[in-house]
Amino acid sequence: MAIVLDGKKVAGQIKADLASRVAGLARMGMVPGLGTVLVGDDPGSMKYVEGKHRDCEEVGIASIRRQLPATATTEDVLAVVRDLNEDPACTGYIIQLPLPAHIDSNAIIGAIDPTKDADGMHPYNLGELVLHVRGDITTPLPCTPRGVLALLDAYGIELAGRNVCVLGRGITIGRTIGLMLTRSGVNATVTLCHTGTRNIEEHIRRADVVIAAVGVAGFVQVEHVKPGAVLIDVGVSRVFDEQAGRMRIVGDVDSEAHAVAGAYSPNPGGVGPMTRAMLLANVVEQAERMAGIREDS
């Protein structure tokens, strides 16, 4: 029977550790603060941001909320970014994506103070990840790839020398997780597949580990999966459940594929909680660097 990689359980353990560390920082007079910048009133984005602030409350991190109307301009958002860059109460912050189409997302992300980049997506921080194949990285790491690796590590799943097929080349995970998987401490062999990849099913069948992040419901079918493979489902799609009479969230991996897998992450309940836990970890680690108590500082 396949091992279920329970992201909720592992994230809970991580948050318990973070809460202890935050309490230690508080005794030193430092309270980490996470800021969120939300533009518009998209229900999905609002729900996601609300979840982040609940996580903050759970571990003792202060919440700093900034919300702008959907009509906000790039300059309006940049003004908030500059304010958070200068705010000593804000240890790190995120820009909730996607932004409205009329806003220059690259300009916004590029204006973030790299040391306050809680998502680990600033060009400087991504560059540090490219440059440092081995050794400690003292800049924030991308949350979703970091969460995937932490989930696999929690279950003792070895990646060194194994073939990993990454489906999707989005900046959130597809283009960044390969950098983390090929670091000297991990040593996986990575194949990145995308819309231009021919015979994509063959790449999936050869993989020991499949990380699916294409956002297409049921993209990975049971006949595509090598028996015993590890399936990490990152994709998010909303489909109408006729039996329940409402929309529900599903992943990229068809549930029938779980029967042949050696291990799999459920969706929801797998990678999502881990991503949120890593966001908190980035904030706490930056606070520890500021306090001079983190070894990699």
UniProtKB/Swiss-Prot annotation:
One Gene Ontology BP term is:
tetrahydrofolate interconversion
Which keywords describe this protein according to UniProt? Amino-acid biosynthesis, Histidine biosynthesis, Hydrolase, Methionine biosynthesis, Multifunctional enzyme, NADP, One-carbon metabolism, Oxidoreductase, Purine biosynthesis
User: Can you tell which superkingdom this protein's organism belongs to?
Assistant: Bacteria
Question: Which CDD domains does its entry note?
Answer: NAD_bind_m-THF_DH_Cyclohyd (cd01080)
Question: Which InterPro entries does the record match to this protein?
Answer: Aminoacid_DH-like_N_sf (IPR046346), NAD(P)-bd_dom_sf (IPR036291), THF_DH/CycHdrlase (IPR000672), THF_DH/CycHdrlase_cat_dom (IPR020630), THF_DH/CycHdrlase_NAD-bd_dom (IPR020631)
Q: Which reaction does it catalyse?
A: (6R)-5,10-methylene-5,6,7,8-tetrahydrofolate + NADP(+) = (6R)-5,10-methenyltetrahydrofolate + NADPH; (6R)-5,10-methenyltetrahydrofolate + H2O = (6R)-10-formyltetrahydrofolate + H(+)
Q: Name one GO cellular component term.
A: cytosol
Q: Which family does it belong to?
A: Belongs to the tetrahydrofolate dehydrogenase/cyclohydrolase family.
Q: What the protein does?
A: Catalyzes the oxidation of 5,10-methylenetetrahydrofolate to 5,10-methenyltetrahydrofolate and then the hydrolysis of 5,10-methenyltetrahydrofolate to 10-formyltetrahydrofolate.
Provide the protein name.
Bifunctional protein FolD
Q: Which organism is it from?
A: Bifidobacterium animalis subsp. lactis (strain AD011)
